Amino acid sequence: MTIMRKKHPLLKMINHSFIDLPTPSNISSWWNFGSLLGMCLMIQILTGLFLAMHYTSDTTTAFSSVAHICRDVNYGWLIRYLHANGASMFFICLFIHVGRGIYYGSYMLLETWNIGIVLLLTTMATAFVGYVLPWGQMSFWGATVITNLLSAIPYXGNTLVEWIWGGFSVDKATLTRFFAFHFILPFIITALVLVHLLFLHETGSNNPSGLDSNSDKIPFHPYYTIKDLLGALILLMVLMILVLFFPDVLGDPDNYTPANPLNTPAHIKPEWYFLFAYAILRSIPNKLGGVLALILSILILATLPLLNSSKQHGLIYRPITQALYWIFVANLLTXTWIGGQPVEXPFTLIGXIASXLXFXIIIIFMPIASTIXNNIPXLH
């Protein structure tokens, strides 16, 4: 008699995805972040659900409802800070996951990579609308500034902005619809994750060597379930240290002041995980140009498979491209720092250099390095 998990239609799908899945035997800890992202998503949906039970999406009561959650709801403070810091952990895992994809050439699995880019954009949209909900100063002004960017679109821009606002400024209608978006988007993300996994399991995972691993596969369970469990425990430990000891370290103090349309904060800035994109946006003096650069800073990931001319898969045996990769990472960290600084010299100059370098490394330098690497054997 065959085992139930191999026969039952539903269990069979789970079995092929998480139990008997043939997995390369040499994938390193950098491959843990996919499962960690799944865990982050579950934490965010669960904590978000409980927050939504007590939150009111009305301009007059939104701020006080968040205060009420923290003060009066049983473990409300824990749920709220798990949700806020869970988002930060989500983005840390996302950036590492994408970085690993670039380093090891996983972008050559085209469908998986493109769905991944859509997932990244959807998660960023979810985080943005979620940041508006507590209705603090930075929520309000962040929403005003970022939605206002759409007015840079020629001809239809201003109409589009007023349509999204539901009026002539960020107000009650905006908050209500942002809450609706913030509620529905994580479920859309979950559906996209399933498609992401579907495409991944069509081809099988990439591995650190960049070679075909069909000759050396092991079952996912118990080897990688145990390995993922260790990653999950480390992530939970870091998250709980953040939540219990430093809950506000990644937040903005301005968000403890209720939203006031008549008083602009000294420095309007988004959450830390958007600062690199914000720096790119600010580094271009033209409004439309800035918006395009902001969008392209994420969409540039889609050009990686097109620009790849290397004969090798991944950067593991390509020292020149490796050096460029780490310069690119350092450059993004620099831009993250610049995005949080005021708009004055020398920060504006550093921001502009970092922005230009980020695009140049991917579009110009990496393809050149690949060509050099391809021709090195010919030089001997």
Curated annotation (Swiss-Prot):
Cofactor: heme b
CDD domains per UniProt: cytochrome_b_C (cd00290), Cytochrome_b_N (cd00284)
Pfam families in the record: Cytochrom_B_C, Cytochrome_B
Entry keywords, A to Z: Electron transport, Heme, Iron, Membrane, Metal-binding, Mitochondrion, Mitochondrion inner membrane, Respiratory chain, Transmembrane, Transmembrane helix, Transport, Ubiquinone
Single annotated GO MF: metal ion binding
Spans through the membrane: 33-53, 77-98, 113-133, 178-198, 226-246, 288-308, 320-340, 347-367
Binding, heme b b562: 83, 182
Complexes and interactors: The cytochrome bc1 complex contains 11 subunits: 3 respiratory subunits (MT-CYB, CYC1 and UQCRFS1), 2 core proteins (UQCRC1 and UQCRC2) and 6 low-molecular weight proteins (UQCRH/QCR6, UQCRB/QCR7, UQCRQ/QCR8, UQCR10/QCR9, UQCR11/QCR10 and a cleavage product of UQCRFS1). This cytochrome bc1 complex then forms a dimer.
PANTHER family: CYTOCHROME B (PTHR19271:SF16)
Family: Belongs to the cytochrome b family.
Record's function text: Component of the ubiquinol-cytochrome c reductase complex (complex III or cytochrome b-c1 complex) that is part of the mitochondrial respiratory chain. The b-c1 complex mediates electron transfer from ubiquinol to cytochrome c. Contributes to the generation of a proton gradient across the mitochondrial membrane that is then used for ATP synthesis.
Misc. comment: Heme 1 (or BL or b562) is low-potential and absorbs at about 562 nm, and heme 2 (or BH or b566) is high-potential and absorbs at about 566 nm.
Record-given protein name: Cytochrome b
